[in-house]
UniProtKB/Swiss-Prot annotation:
Role played: Acts on leucine, isoleucine and valine.
InterPro entries assigned to the protein according to its UniProt record, in alphabetical order: Aminotrans_IV (IPR001544), Aminotrans_IV_CS (IPR018300), Aminotransferase-like (IPR036038), BCAT-like_C (IPR043132), BCAT-like_N (IPR043131), BCAT_family (IPR033939), Class-IV_PLP-Dep_Aminotrnsfr (IPR050571)
Tree of life domain: Bacteria
Protein's name according to its UniProt entry: Probable branched-chain-amino-acid aminotransferase
UniProt keyword Membrane, yes or no: no
UniProt GO MF annotations: L-isoleucine-2-oxoglutarate transaminase activity; L-leucine-2-oxoglutarate transaminase activity; L-valine-2-oxoglutarate transaminase activity
Residues carrying N6-(pyridoxal phosphate)lysine: 153
GO cellular component, as recorded: cytosol
Reactions accelerated catalytically: L-leucine + 2-oxoglutarate = 4-methyl-2-oxopentanoate + L-glutamate; L-isoleucine + 2-oxoglutarate = (S)-3-methyl-2-oxopentanoate + L-glutamate; L-valine + 2-oxoglutarate = 3-methyl-2-oxobutanoate + L-glutamate
CDD domains: BCAT_beta_family
Organism of origin: Rickettsia typhi (strain ATCC VR-144 / Wilmington)
Amino acid sequence: MIKLEQICRYVWINGDLIPYQFARIHVLTHSLHYSGSVFEGERAYNGKVFKLKEHTERLIQSAEALGLKVPYSVDEIIKAHEFLITHNNIKDAYIRPLIWCGDESLNITNPALSTNFLIASIPSMPMSCEQGVNLHVSRWRKAMPDSTPVQSKSAAQYNMAITSKKEAKALGYDDALLLDYEGFIAECTTTNIFFVKDTTLYTPIADRFLNGITRKTIIEIAKNLCLEVKEERLKLAQIEYFTGCFVTGTAIEVQNISSIDLGDKKILFEDCKIADLLKKEYLRIVRG
């Protein structure tokens, strides 16, 4: 396995460019103990970050939802990205901006806590799987939207996703399908899900989970290709009537789903034509 120190030269922290091996935080960092950090996952294609403004605006909104004050403007954050990409000399990169609280206090809240900002970039790694992905339905449910800021991309939101994926992997699956608190289909652990029937896409309403930037892009592409898109509450019992299924995300882009195991039966998806068409158009757009 390649270590990050082998592929990441510099990290941008609080306005300074720091060699990877010297980028450190204290063990008593507040966000390390209380999951009080927010982040983004971004992709650069040929040196240009796709939808960087949208990612940056969402990052700031995520921080504000947790009461974190971001000391940089959208334009300053964009320039920091460009600065880091140039110095790391990586054209196709996965980029991780992160905002977190410092180590001034371990109290749950304290006005003395500092807000810190990091941007890291590493070469993009192949994430998609040509033969498709097999899903297991997780026993864990997404939280109610009035119990946590679901549109905030915060570290705390990923605890259940990590647990669900670990359990799915241990059972021999590739990933987990997550349901919301009412038992409707929500998303996968780090991706948004779509189903296909003829020339119509079906996808859960994004009010109970993070509305992905790639998800929104794919919906826009689909409509431009004269495909119908229906956003609605979807039950597990409905999925056997769909012929195709795929997921979307910044890292994975567009990935076909081969099967979803419901426990009493496994639903197979063999129609990849729509997903392949959308992926082809998506890659054309991001690579400009």
